[in-house]
């Protein structure tokens, strides 16, 4: 066998690192999606096509030099769509998506409206059928169990386990899926 190692891409040219995959890395077919920084647009969503060795920035979610840090709290593939946490700099960390079949990227939900972030998936993320379950903070009820139905694009709080503004932190210490029961 030919055991060799090579640099695939110099995303942040010069001596500085691009920190590829620091927050997320997901393979979809021949394409690897990951977080990286080119030194001018912060940590953003990038891709590398292994079939033709091309590398490109998929989305500059937080335009300018700031970082969106895609996948810092969560990243999961559902069909052809990547779901991940990211910040655009004005709404804090929220749930975002990228459709790999048509290259569109969008904020799925602004769970904690305003400049605060809901930090989706900080404690858990689990897919049951077409529904993504995750922890999030809406700014009023603390970290609770939330869901996003990928088939109809609806997002809702499943339960206020620790009623009031306290945090139940679902999934912080354990998450188990048995059949379709979380």
Identify what each model region corresponds to:
Residues 1-182:
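Feature 14080 marks short, conserved micro-sites in well-ordered regions
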């Amino acid at each position: 066998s030919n055991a060799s190692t090579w640099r695939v891409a110099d995303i942040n040219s010069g001596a500085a690192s691009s920190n590829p995959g620091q927050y997320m890395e997901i393979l979809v077919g021949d394409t690897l999606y990951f977080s990286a920084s080119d030194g001018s647009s912060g940590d953003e969503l990038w891709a590398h096509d292994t079939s033709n060795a091309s590398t490109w920035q998929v989305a500059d979610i937080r335009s300018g030099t700031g970082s969106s840090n895609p996948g810092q709290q969560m990243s999961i593939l559902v069909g052809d769509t990547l779901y991940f946490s990211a910040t655009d700099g004005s709404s804090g960390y929220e749930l975002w998506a990228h459709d790999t079949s048509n290259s569109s990227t969008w904020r799925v939900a602004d769970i904690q409206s305003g400049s605060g972030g809901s930090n989706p998936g900080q404690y858990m993320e689990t897919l049951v059928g077409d529904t993504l379950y995750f922890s999030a903070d809406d700014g009023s009820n603390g970290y609770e169990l939330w869901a996003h139905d990928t088939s109809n694009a609806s997002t809702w709080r499943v339960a206020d386990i620790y009623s009031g503004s306290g945090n139940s932190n679902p999934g912080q210490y354990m998450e188990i899926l048995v059949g379709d029961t979380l």
